[in-house]
């Protein structure tokens, strides 16, 4: 099990790298994260929902995502509440006190049972399971009833490696302090450390490593270099330093609201060689010292709290910037929650996201959205038709809202996408359904389809629709595979593989 001294220490990346390293050696390996808190998620082969990082780790194992890889997923919908997803299915929305406070016993008992159930199933199918912890195991206020870190490791008798990020400073204090706050049995479970994101001459670090090993009696299993331009799906936070200027003057800007979700949708554009890409947030606008949003294509991504994020968008004056952008001939694309915002009306009569009520949309698409209790989760494939061309497209849908055209005449104009659900049986899969909406003037496009730009031909067609005539096709899946192999190569060079293998071998039950 890989645990970290802090969030963003490198746990997800190390697990993905170990998974790819083992899978390339022919080991029957799978990833596992007992409990994850993230806004980026993926649809699984069994019709559920897991954290995006576990979907990436599954790809590292050459596996399709399954709900057992991440049995508990917490998706924050406000500063104090989160949707609880258990083995792929949305269960309820709880306040923080319900799963971290004195009232948490019922939740934690249920969650632990689900976690152990999924882990046992994986143990029957795979020779090796590489487990990822969450945050830090030394959070004193979260240790009671813990199922994400040492609580899980103790329950299944799992060895632990602790990773720390040296790039932020204080790596020795982080490692020693984390170890000191663990119980004796938990300390004994820690088999070694990994130091992550090191820059410079490794010989200058050696005296610190020698001291750490002598003081803790634990080995340092490796020092991993800072990997520049490692393009892998981010678990939650936006990718560091996303701004990228290209030779082309074609500008793509993505709005960032407080509950932005599945921002990995735009990774193919962020990496596209012909695109000047950036996010638009409070921070970027403050740095630019201007409210202006200059772009050819403006994207409204998904949201875990659509009505609250729409209110935030208006508070920033971005609604006026969108209107100005369209007056000057720009294009706007809304994905999932962003699609709903572009419609006429958003209703939440059951308080699915936060509080019940109705919000007026931005009014660019003739649709009305209402949130339902049952979440739509499906992997889909089909066709996208724009500017007189039709191409293949593939992706997934995760949404509680159901959008309807306002009138039959709006519906008669046809949707830009025609899809089938890949998770259903052959007979049902033959029944295609429409998705999305294109404004009458052709400037505003909306869809529920996540992963839209992962299909090279669809990405190319949307860029042409937006005004980039000679747009190249970019294959994000091929890039992801290259980056996973690159990561595995780095681990093979910088980790003590014999020690790592000894830890794995000792943990395998007869």
UniProtKB/Swiss-Prot annotation:
Pathway: Cofactor biosynthesis; adenosylcobalamin biosynthesis
Signal peptide: none
The keyword Chloroplast is assigned to this record: no
Domain GATase cobBQ-type stretches: 249-458
Molecular function per GO: ABC-type vitamin B12 transporter activity; catalytic activity
Gene Ontology biological process: cobalamin biosynthetic process
Active site residues per record: 336 (nucleophile), 450
Keyword terms: Cobalamin biosynthesis, Glutamine amidotransferase
Pfam families noted in UniProt: CbiA (PF01656), GATase_3 (PF07685)
InterPro entries found in the cross-reference section: Class_I_gatase-like (IPR029062), CobQ/CobB/MinD/ParA_Nub-bd_dom (IPR002586), CobQ_GATase1 (IPR033949), CobQ_N (IPR047045), CobQ_synth (IPR004459), GATase_3 (IPR011698), P-loop_NTPase (IPR027417)
Superkingdom classification of source: Bacteria
Function: Catalyzes amidations at positions B, D, E, and G on adenosylcobyrinic A,C-diamide. NH(2) groups are provided by glutamine, and one molecule of ATP is hydrogenolyzed for each amidation.
Family, per entry: Belongs to the CobB/CobQ family. CobQ subfamily.
Name of this protein: Cobyric acid synthase
Chain's gene name: cobQ
């Amino acid at each position: 099990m890989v645990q970290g001294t802090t969030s963003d220490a490198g746990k997800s990346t190390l697990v993905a790298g170990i998974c790819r390293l083992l899978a390339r050696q022919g080991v029957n390996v799978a990833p596992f994260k007992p409990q994850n808190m993230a806004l980026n998620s993926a649809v699984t082969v069994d019709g559920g929902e897991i954290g995006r990082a576990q979907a990436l780790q599954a790809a590292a194992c050459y596996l399709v995502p399954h709900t057992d890889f991440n049995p508990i997923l917490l998706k924050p919908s406000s500063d104090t509440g989160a949707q609880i997803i258990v083995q792929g299915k949305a269960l309820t929305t709880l306040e923080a006190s319900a799963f971290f406070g004195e009232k948490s016993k019922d939740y934690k008992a249920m969650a632990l049972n689900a976690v152990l159930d999924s882990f046992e199933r994986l143990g029957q199918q795979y020779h090796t399971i590489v487990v990822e912890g969450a945050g830090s195991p030394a959070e004193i206020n979260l240790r009671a009833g813990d199922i994400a870190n040492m609580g899980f490791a103790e329950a299944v008798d799992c060895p632990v490696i602790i990773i720390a990020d040296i790039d932020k400073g204080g790596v020795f204090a982080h490692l020693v302090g984390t170890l000191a706050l663990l119980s004796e049995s938990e300390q004994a479970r820690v088999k070694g450390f990994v130091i992550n994101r090191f820059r410079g001459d490794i010989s200058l670090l050696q005296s610190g490593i020698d001291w750490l090993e002598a003081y803790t009696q634990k080995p340092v299993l490796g020092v991993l270099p800072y990997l520049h331009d490692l393009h892998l799906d981010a678990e939650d936070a936006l990718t560091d330093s996303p701004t990228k200027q290209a030779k082309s003057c074609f500008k793509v800007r993505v709005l960032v609201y407080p509950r932005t979700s599945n921002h990995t949708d735009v990774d193919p554009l962020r990496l596209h060689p012909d695109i000047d890409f950036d996010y638009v947030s409070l921070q970027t606008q403050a740095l630019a010292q201007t409210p202006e949003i200059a772009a050819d294509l403006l994207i409204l991504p998904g949201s875990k709290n659509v009505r609250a994020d729409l209110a935030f968008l208006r508070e920033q004056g971005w609604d006026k910037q969108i209107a100005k952008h369209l007056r000057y001939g720009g294009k706007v694309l809304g994905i999932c929650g962003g699609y709903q915002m572009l419609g006429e009306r958003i209703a939440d009569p059951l308080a699915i996201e936060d509080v019940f009520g109705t919000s007026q949309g931005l009014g660019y698409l003739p649709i009305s959205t209402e949130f339902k209790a049952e979440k739509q989760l499906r992997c889909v494939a089909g066709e996208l038709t724009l500017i007189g061309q039709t191409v293949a497209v593939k992706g997934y849908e995760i949404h509680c809202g159901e959008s309807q055209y306002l009138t039959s005449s709006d519906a008669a104009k046809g949707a830009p996408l025609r899809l089938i659900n890949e998770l259903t049986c052959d007979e049902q899969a033959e029944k295609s359904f429409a998705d999305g909406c294109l404004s009458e003037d052709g400037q505003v496009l909306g869809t529920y389809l996540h992963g839209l730009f992962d299909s090279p031909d669809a990405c190319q067609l949307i860029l042409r629709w937006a005004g980039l005539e000679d747009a190249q096709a970019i294959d994000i899946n091929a890039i992801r595979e290259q980056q996973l192999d690159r990561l595995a190569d780095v681990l093979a060079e910088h980790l003590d593989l014999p020690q790592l293998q000894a830890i794995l071998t000792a943990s395998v039950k007869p």
